[in-house]
Amino acid sequence: MVFWDTSALLKLYVAEPDSNAFAMLAKRGGALAISVWTTHEILCGLHRKELLRDLKRGGSEAIYERFLLQITAGTLHVISYTTRVAEHTTEVIRRCYSARKPVAIRTLDALQLGSAFGGGADEVVSTDARIRAAAKILNLRISPDFPF
C-alpha cells in the first residue's frame, strides 16, 4: 500500500510546478492511502493557499468538496485512528528519537507515519523533509525519489 502525506496529496489538487510528477505517481494504481488527520490538514493547506491568493476566493472549499467526494468514491482510502495506529505512532516516535541520526519528528507527522504503518503501507509519498527522514529510519520506500 502507498501512503500519501498531505504535502504530496495537496499537489494533486492545486497546480504547482511539480504537480504533474505527482499525478503520474498517483496513477500507478490502487486507492491512495491517507490518514484521518489528512482530512483536516488538507483543509488547512487549501485555506492557506486561498489566503495567499494561490487559489481564487471560495476555491479552497470547492476543492475540499472534490476531495471528500474522492473519499466517498474510494479513490482515497482513509486510515482511521485505532489502537493499532496509536501503537505504531509510539513506535515511530521512539525509533525517530533513538536513531543514530535522530529525527525530531513532530506529533502530527508521527501520527501520519503511525497511520501508514497501521494501514500496512510499505511506501510513503511526501515532500516533507522530516517525514522523508523518518520514513528512511522506518525502512519505508520514499517517493518521489528526486530531492526537495
Residue ranges and their predicted role:
Residues 33-34, 80, 107, 126:
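Short beta-strand scaffold positions
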Residues 72-100, 108-110:
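Acidic catalytic patch
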Residues 52-82:
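Helix-adjacent hinge/juxtasegments
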Residues 1, 101, 113-148:
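Acidic, PIN/NYN-like endoribonuclease modules and their adjacent C-terminal/linker elements
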Residues 1-14, 70-85:
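An acidic intrinsically disordered interaction segment
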Residues 29-32, 75-77, 118-123:
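Short active-site oxyanion
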Residues 1-63, 129, 138-143:
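Short, well-structured N-terminal submotif of metal-dependent ribonuclease cores
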